[in-house]
Amino acid sequence: MALTKAEMAEHLFETLGINKRVAKEMVEAFFEEIRQALESGEQVKLSGFGNFDLRDKNQRPGRNPKTGEDIPISARRVVTFRPGQKLKSRVEEANAK
């Protein structure tokens, strides 16, 4: 099961007692801030959680799986996420139970 933005907003509503519209706007604003930072080439560091980075990938050879034809995969920039040590530890502890 995946955690959705709607579920995050619902949790804010229940935990903080703010109205649902404000909770939804807060979640949207949070993700928009991350999106804008990455679009402008910035790294996003969330203390205790992890880092979102941009990585440039070079062009490389590929193959069309239907035809077997060799095709180039173009160079592109991708978003990567590296979990922080606290997050890694908590996930490991949760899985150990």
Curated annotation (Swiss-Prot):
Transmembrane feature ranges: none
Alphabetical GO biological process terms: DNA recombination; positive regulation of metabolic process; regulation of DNA-templated transcription; regulation of translation
Gene giving rise to this polypeptide: ihfA
Signal peptide region: none
Lineage: Bacteria, Pseudomonadati, Pseudomonadota, Gammaproteobacteria, Alteromonadales
Keyword line: DNA recombination, DNA-binding, Transcription, Transcription regulation, Translation regulation
Known function: This protein is one of the two subunits of integration host factor, a specific DNA-binding protein that functions in genetic recombination as well as in transcriptional and translational control.
Region (Disordered): 49-71
GO cellular component, as recorded: cytosol
Presence of keyword DNA-binding: yes
Name of the protein: Integration host factor subunit alpha
Organism field: Shewanella woodyi (strain ATCC 51908 / MS32)
PROSITE patterns: HISTONE_LIKE (PS00045)
Similarity field: Belongs to the bacterial histone-like protein family.
Any Pfam family hit: Bac_DNA_binding
